[in-house]
Amino acid sequence: MELHGASAADISRQLVTKQISAKEVVRYFLERMARLDAGLNAFVHVNGELSLRQAEQVDNHRARGDALGPLAGVPIAIKDLLCTTDMPTTCGSRFCAGYMSPYDGTVIAKMRAAGMPWLGKTNLDEFAMGGSTETSIFGATRNPWDVERTSGGSSGGSAACVAAGLAPLAIGTDTGGSIRQPAAFCGVSGFKPTYGCVSRYGVVAYASSLDQVGPMAHTVEDLALAMDVISGHDPLDSTSLPRATPGYEARLSQAPHRFRVGVVREQIENEGLNPEVRAAIVSALSVLKECGGEVREISLPHSKSWVPAYYVIAPCEASSNLSRFDGAHFGFR
């Protein structure tokens, strides 16, 4: 049995047809983590007994013929920025060392209700404020393809564990690239949803007007399955969009419609753009054309101000969000 290269959708199909049990799936990944993660440092908290207990509950429901969602029994790794009642939430910081949340974040509660066992919490830059997963109190996370290179950040642990086959799915957060960049560095798929599509309740804030929770996986189909679980309106998040989950996975099976892709001239012609990155973008655009897409060049002259604007907004909001910790006594002082 080799599951480390399987997609979440493949594992789901094997679970539904009872070729394998949820407990066997979780045990497989726990054993693989025990062998390989010491050299990667993708996980910072693991509770094998909890993971197996969650998997056993799914197996019991399936044995009784209870209705289950498509990801029931498919394990997932969680960035250590989301509040969980049964594992520490440390944000990669000594300040929060040993902190146990009294409540689950909304995304966590949705995954729990969907029957998804969690394999553990993954490494990140401290408070998600970085792009290399090197500023964590737990040490740096290594890139599975070359341990001398960075996994990216701040969701580097989530990207690395999927790339290394330690988990079929992972949850990250993205403020200024923290899902997309490590996914690219580690060769997996990552998705930052539109702001408000996924609840931020129970996510330790970095920059509140930019933060979003999103999935990381081997395939786009897996991302869609995960989005069907974690997205949707949440009254506990004032920025949550008041609309139902659109059915991401169902849309993948629909006949493709024509679509337009805008290529920002100022970005593709930027002197600072690495030639290899430019070549990869051009190659991707060719694939999109083959899929029926209309590629159109557009001009956004203000794009030169994007990064400076980010470095005004994000640090200001981060300063405000971190100030709420002042006077609290969780970890080291």
PLM regions and their residue ranges:
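Short glycine/serine-rich loop segments
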Residues: Y103-H233
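A short helix-breaking turn/cap at a secondary-structure junction
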Residues: K192-A279, S283
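Enzymes and membrane/adaptor proteins characterized by extended Gly/Ser/Thr/Asp/Glu-rich
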Residues: P70-K110
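Acyltransferase
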Residues: A22-V26, E56-D59, G247-A250, L273-L300, ...
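Residue-level signal for inorganic ion chemistry
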Residues: F29, S51, D104, L223, ...
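An N-terminal boundary/leader segment
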Residues: M1-L52, E290-G292
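Short, well-ordered beta-strand elements within core beta-sheets of diverse protein domains
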Residues: I11-T17, A77, F95-M100, D211-H218
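Serine-dependent amide/ester hydrolase catalytic core
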Residues: D10-R13, T17, N123, E269, ...
